[in-house]
Curated annotation (Swiss-Prot):
It holds the Pfam family DUF179. GO terms for cellular component: cytosol. It comes from Chlamydia caviae (strain ATCC VR-813 / DSM 19441 / 03DC25 / GPIC) (Chlamydophila caviae). Belongs to the UPF0301 (AlgH) family. This is UPF0301 protein CCA_00630. HAMAP family: UPF0301. It comes from the Bacteria.
Length: 189
């Protein structure tokens, strides 16, 4: 797997929390960077799933046929806001391509339509987001709080999000692979 140098801190990168980041929701988090500019950055956490059921408040029909829907905590900011990460390229006017085959956006009617389809695309319903002010993410990166990896469909819609942090570090190889085995509780080491 190709390494991403610091100069490519951009949309479509994955941020992996360093093993010594123990700041609640960001501990061992994998964040898809959805926007990065001089004004700031925002992303969605991929590996903190929520144990939610499909809600009647969201869907106006009786049967949800798409089994590829997952609820995620996108981050600690505006936790009542829902964002859609999905693999459907058919509504390009409503979505932003983050990396190949991964899109952000869509409205409630789009969500209901794809939820009703057995062959519907993979969807992460993300509640909240992670955000950084101008220069903040760069500073955190230079301090060693984050590692970078390229985003891909396979990572964003991983079948095992709980293991995603370790998997990506192993895939990066070298020193990153050895970090993937560091226990969450260093007292157990």
């Amino acid at each position: 797997m190709a390494k991403i140098p610091y100069a490519i801190l951009e949309k479509g990168s994955l941020l992996l929390a360093s093993p010594d980041t123990d700041q609640g929701v960001f501990a061992r988090s994998v964040i898809l960077l959805c926007e990065h500019s001089l004004n700031g950055s925002f992303g969605l956490i991929l590996n903190k799933t929520l144990g939610l059921e499909i809600s009647d408040d969201i869907f106006t029909f009786d049967k949800v046929s798409n089994n590829n829907i997952r609820f995620c905590m996108g981050g600690p900011l505006q936790a009542n806001q829902m964002m859609l990460l999905h693999s459907c390229s058919e509504i390009s006017e409503q979505t932003l391509e983050i990396c190949p085959s991964v899109y952000l956006g869509g409205d409630l009617s789009f969500l209901q339509e794809i939820a009703a389809s057995e062959s519907g695309p993979t969807i992460n319903l993300c509640f909240g987001y992670s955000g950084w002010q101008a220069g903040q993410l760069e500073k955190e990166f230079l301090e060693g709080n984050w590692f970078l990896a390229p985003a891909s469909y396979e990572y964003v819609f991983s079948d095992n999000p709980d293991n995603l942090w370790s998997r990506i570090l192993k895939d990066l190889g070298g020193k990153y692979a050895s970090l993937s085995t560091v226990p969450e509780n260093l007292l157990l080491n």
